[in-house]
């Protein structure tokens, strides 16, 4: 083509591998006019290098929630850490997790599950947030998830601090309280911080129980450890009926027995998975807001998630990745790997239900 040709053309390949011939100056506009992909498969690292392209969760197509009526599992970022009381930075978690998720592939090596064959999956983008107003942000996040839930999409979220789970549950658990498998170093059932603050990353599950979103008798917390402010930090949840497996009991029981106990507690009812990366020993996940030594290993975490296959799962999150404290990127890579583990379990459950 001549240098002076104003109508020179460029061939561009989208995630569906269909090429479009368009005037070069219209490429950007046209890209954002496309609302639905023709394929919900991720881009292969054999077709586009992992360091190239625009980062989406697991290299899936981006679909706005308003256009996501075909999507069955939506991966969502919640870039907010306004509930953090110690080391901030989890607001940057979704971006870093997206970047590292280029390492994800299509087939689970142990189970053989192919989540992208079982379900239509997409990156639904980030929720809107207000970094200077907690309650406004909670409302914005809930409104985003209301749209997701109303379309029957199963959400898999990346935080963000652990307070983000509360507005997700407000959208997801409106019909009835649900059970939960909660991996964490902390119970997150405190009442208030600094006398007045009801909404922090240490209070979401107390609020969820009070609001009738979470059934404490169908809730199991795994990996709890670390010093307390007072005895009441632990006692309130136990009084509500939460099954708390502290790290000492975890080590005594072993992974298989912990899985069996978790399955017994949640039963056959609708169940949510919430995974705080600080359940892991900081050797494996240093990039988090409230690290506690003596945690579980990454391999144990993988086995625990695989042990939830067959449950009635309605959604999940992975939270508290703080990139400013994750110099090597290992914590984000761990989060990506665990999100893929959870995605496989969710996809199997969703496909069985359909």
Feature locations, PLM:
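N-terminal amphipathic/basic-hydrophobic helices that include classical n-h-c signal peptides
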Residues: 1-32
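Catalytic cores of soluble, metal-dependent hydrolases
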Residues: 32-80, 86-156, 163-175, 236-239, ...
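Short helix/loop capping segments that flank catalytic or ligand/cofactor-binding pockets
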Residues: 84-86, 191, 230
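Short, structured patches in soluble enzyme cores that scaffold and shape functional sites
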Residues: 182-185, 221-226, 246-248, 320
């Amino acid at each position: 083509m001549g240098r002076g040709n104003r109508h020179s053309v460029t061939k561009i390949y989208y995630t569906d591998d269909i090429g479009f011939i368009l005037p070069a100056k219209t490429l950007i506009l046209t890209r954002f006019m496309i609302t639905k992909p023709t394929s919900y498969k991720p881009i292969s690292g054999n077709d586009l290098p992992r360091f190239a392209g625009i980062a989406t969760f697991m290299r899936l197509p981006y679909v706005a929630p308003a256009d996501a009526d075909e999507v069955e599992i939506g991966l969502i970022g919640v870039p907010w850490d306004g509930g953090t009381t110690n080391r901030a930075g989890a607001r940057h978690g979704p971006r870093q997790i997206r970047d590292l998720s280029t390492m994800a592939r299509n087939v689970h090596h142990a189970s053989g599950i192919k989540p992208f064959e079982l379900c239509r999956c997409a990156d639904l983008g980030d929720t809107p947030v207000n970094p200077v107003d907690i309650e406004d942000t909670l409302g914005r996040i809930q409104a985003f998830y209301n749209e997701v839930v109303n379309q029957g999409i199963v959400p898999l979220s990346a935080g963000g601090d652990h307070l983000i789970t509360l507005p997700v549950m407000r959208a997801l658990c409106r019909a009835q309280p649900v059970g939960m498998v909660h991996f964490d170093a902390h119970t997150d059932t405190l009442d208030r911080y600094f006398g007045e603050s009801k909404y922090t990353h240490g209070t979401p599950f107390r609020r969820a129980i009070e609001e009738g979103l979470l059934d404490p008798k169908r809730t199991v917390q795994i990996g709890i450890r670390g010093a307390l402010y007072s005895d009441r930090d632990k006692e309130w949840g136990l009084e509500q009926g939460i099954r708390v497996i502290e790290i000492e009991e975890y080590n005594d029981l072993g992974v298989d027995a912990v899985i069996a106990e978790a399955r017994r507690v949640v039963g056959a009812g609708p169940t949510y998975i919430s995974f705080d990366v600080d359940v892991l020993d900081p050797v494996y996940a240093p990039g988090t807001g409230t690290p506690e030594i003596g945690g579980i290993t990454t391999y144990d975490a993988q086995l625990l998630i695989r042990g939830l296959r067959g449950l009635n799962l309605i959604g999940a999150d992975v939270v508290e990745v703080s990139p400013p404290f994750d110099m090597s990127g290992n914590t984000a890579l761990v989060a990506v790997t665990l999100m893929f583990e959870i995605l496989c379990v969710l996809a199997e459950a969703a496909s069985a239900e359909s």
